[in-house]
Amino acid sequence: MSRIGKLPIAIPPKVEVTLDGRRVVVKGPKGTLDLTLPDSVEVVREDGRLLVTRRGESRRAREQHGLGRTLVANMVTGVTTGFTKPMQIAGVGYRVALTGRKLTINAGFSHPIEIELPAGIDIEVDPKASAIAGTRNQQGFNFVIKGFDKQAVGDLAAKIRDIRPPEPYKGKGIRYTAEKILLKAGKSGKK
């Protein structure tokens, strides 16, 4: 039995779960999420909890067991409390601003990059520049991506980070707040 897959998922009071064959729909205060599970996994409701079981003992079924349980648990967590991904942008002239549902990023290119926010995702931008830890004296901005779908929050965060990943000499670029960048020493020069 999968160590993760065998754990029950508690259903909070304000969450409504609908099971329809392989399809799971979770509705809560923050929104609605649905998921179609693989054939090898099924979800059963028992005593106000959800149990994820596998239909066979094949390697594929064992792999999908823990994954299916984690996906359903993330859906329940998402519609109740939501997910956040704090990020930072550091560098001279690097800025991030939110106008309506459009995020504008100035990251050292000749033009600003605009990203339309997907439905169910919000971004909170700290308007004050502050020193960014883990860089060599770089000022920057903090912003937080929020949403009830963990996958959508992570996808948007990765898309934003890919615009200008942190460089290894001064740490300039866009990074996750918890990310540690190993800074390299520059050239030593002539001796």
Swiss-Prot record:
Protein function: This protein binds to the 23S rRNA, and is important in its secondary structure. It is located near the subunit interface in the base of the L7/L12 stalk, and near the tRNA binding site of the peptidyltransferase center.
One term under GO cellular component: cytosolic large ribosomal subunit
Domain of life of the organism encoding this protein: Bacteria
Database matches in SUPFAM superfamilies: Ribosomal protein L6
Family statement: Belongs to the universal ribosomal protein uL6 family.
Pfam families according to UniProt: Ribosomal_L6
Primary gene name: rplF
Protein name per the record: Large ribosomal subunit protein uL6
UniProt cross-references to PROSITE patterns, sorted A to Z: RIBOSOMAL_L6_1
Higher taxonomy: Bacteria, Bacillati, Cyanobacteriota, Cyanophyceae, Gloeobacterales
Gene Ontology MF terms: rRNA binding; structural constituent of ribosome
